[in-house]
Every structure is written in C-alpha cells, then in structure tokens.
UniProtKB/Swiss-Prot annotation:
Gene this protein is translated from: argB
Residues at the site labelled Transition state stabilizer: 25, 247
Keywords associated with the record: Amino-acid biosynthesis, Arginine biosynthesis, ATP-binding, Cytoplasm, Kinase, Nucleotide-binding, Transferase
Protein name as catalogued: Acetylglutamate kinase
Biological process (GO), any one: L-arginine biosynthetic process
GO molecular function list: acetylglutamate kinase activity; ATP binding
Source species: Methanospirillum hungatei JF-1 (strain ATCC 27890 / DSM 864 / NBRC 100397 / JF-1)
Single GO cellular component term: cytoplasm
InterPro entries: AceGlu_kinase-like_sf, AcgluKinase_fam, ArgB, Asp/Glu/Uridylate_kinase, Glu/AcGlu_kinase, NAGK-C
Length: 294
C-alpha cells in the first residue's frame, strides 16, 4: 500500500476517534525490550497528537520475578496469582514504580509527549480489598492459601485521570491499589486496565500482548472480529486457554461494563497499534457487539 493510501485510509478513523479516550495495556516482551517499547510509545504519542486521550496501564510480572530471583527469593503462584508477602510487595513496588513506570514516562517525553507516572494507590485512584483465601488441591486434599497483599478491585476514582487527560497529559499507571485502611495491594494489570476503561467511559480497551490476537483451534488464523459471546464460547470450549484466559476475561468484563470496543494485538511488531486502529482490516482481534461503528 502506498504511503498516501495509508494516510487516506487513516483519516476517517482519526476523525471518528478525536476526543475519545482509550486505555492501552502494555505487557509481554515489549516490557523488557526497550526498542520495541520505544516504538509502541511513539505510536501512543501519535494517537495523542491527533486528539485521542490515551491512558497507559503497564504490567511487570516477569521483571518482578527476575528481581526476586536475583535477591534469592523464589516466586510463588496460586491460580496464576502471585503470592505477595511483605518482601514481594516491596519488590513489586520497586520494579513497577521505580523502574518500569519511570522508563515509560521517559520514553513518552523523548517522543515529544507529556506523561505523568502514577500508581493505583495515588489519589485513591484504585480502591481494592484483600483477596479472599484461594482454594487449591495439594496431594488429593483441598487447602486454602492466603495470597498476602493481593487485591481485588472494588472502586475506581478517575477524577485525577480526567484532569490529566483534559490537560493533554498521558497517565502511565502501575498496577497497585490501596484498601480503605490505607494499605497497599498488588493487583492484576489486565483487570486494572479493564476497570479503568469502564470508569473512564473509554471508547476502546487495547491489550498488547505477545500473540497476534485470539487464534482459532488449529492456531493457523487470527479472528479479526468477534462478539463477546463468541469469546465466551471459545473459553468454554478450550480454544482460549492458559495465559490468554485472564486477558480475555478482563476484556469481557470491560465490554459488559459499557466499553464499546476491545482489541487484543501483538505488541512486539512495529506500529501494530496504529495499524489496528487506523486500517479497515486491522492486525489483531477486535471484540464488540456493535455492527457498523468502530
């Protein structure tokens, strides 16, 4: 496709999305590859420059695990959730806020944008409660495990985000929360992104991962568009499995909460974010029950 054709195809999408908000969840290999991350951030800054209000939510699980191992501490998980004792919470805060968040903010500035790095516990942005003990099977018997400082989101207070967005800043949010007694909690980044999208009334939730989207059973083709019901059936039938399940569930929660469109795309390929949003074919999976709009 010629360069002028790309620009002309993008124009109606730019016009349609102008002034609308989008929550972009960054995860996967892009989080540890600065070159890939730099490309993604440049795309986000471009979105802002054409009038789209962007919120970035980032993960950091692999980096937390790496830091813990370097400190001689073995990570532990139950049902995909990290057991977060006092030391683990301290490491998570160090990695998420001190390393990843600050790096993203710097990349936004380098690309010509303006970002503000915050955590979910800043300004009581994300209120959560300590997650209930989880039941697991150990040697043919059921046990309950305390996950420690792991939170389940109860409330989003988006006033700070609206202020930042209205003043042309890009909020960059670490997946931490605070309970009603002022205690810090670790939360799932996919879940946080979905709940923030609902609270903001976002037009789109975009999950950037290490895969091209939701694949068919044979793993030979990416579904370009599907309804929430289609996605639920793929989970029930086992086509969507393992690490994709929590990502798709977070997307479905956002859609059921009023977000019109959700996308799952590969964040490791240059300019996939732009191609997904500004071309008719896209590059990943769009989930929506809308028919005509984008």
């Amino acid at each position: 496709m010629k360069r002028e054709d790309v620009l002309m195809e993008a124009l109606p999408y730019i016009q349609k999305f102008h002034g609308r908000s989008m929550v972009i969840k960054l995860g996967g290999h892009a989080m540890v590859d600065t070159c890939i991350m730099d490309t993604v951030i440049r795309d986000v800054v471009l979105l802002q420059l054409v009038g789209i209000k962007c919120v970035i939510v980032h993960g950091g699980g692999p980096e937390i695990t790496e830091k813990m191992k370097a400190m001689g501490k073995q990570p532990r998980f139950v049902s995909g959730l990290r057991i977060t004792d006092d030391d683990t919470l301290e490491v998570a805060q160090m990695v998420l806020v001190g390393k990843i968040n600050s790096k993203i903010v710097s990349l936004v500035s380098r690309a010509g944008g303006r970002a503000v790095g915050i955590s979910g516990n800043d300004a009581n942005l994300i209120i959560a409660r300590k997650m209930d003990r989880q039941k697991v099977r150990v040697e043919n018997r059921e046990e309950e495990v305390d996950l420690g400082h792991v939170g389940e989101i109860e409330e989003i207070r988006p006033a700070l985000l609206h202020t930042l967005l209205d003043n042309q800043f890009i909020p960059v949010i670490s997946p931490l929360a605070i309970d009603r007694n002022g205690n810090d909690l670790n939360i799932n980044a996919d879940t946080a992104a979905g709940e923030l999208a609902i609270a903001l009334g976002a037009h789109k939730l975009i999950s950037m991962t290490d895969v091209d989207g939701i694949m068919n059973r044979e793993r030979t083709e990416v579904y370009r568009r599907m309804t929430p019901q289609d996605a639920e059936e793929l989970i029930a039938s086992g086509v969507v499995s393992e690490g994709m399940i929590p990502k798709v569930l977070a997307v479905l929660r956002a859609l059921h909460g009023g977000v019109p469109y959700a996308h799952i795309i590969n964040g490791n390929l240059a300019h996939n974010l732009i191609m997904e949003l500004f071309t008719a074919e896209g590059v990943g999976t769009m989930i929506t029950d809308r028919i005509d709009e984008v």
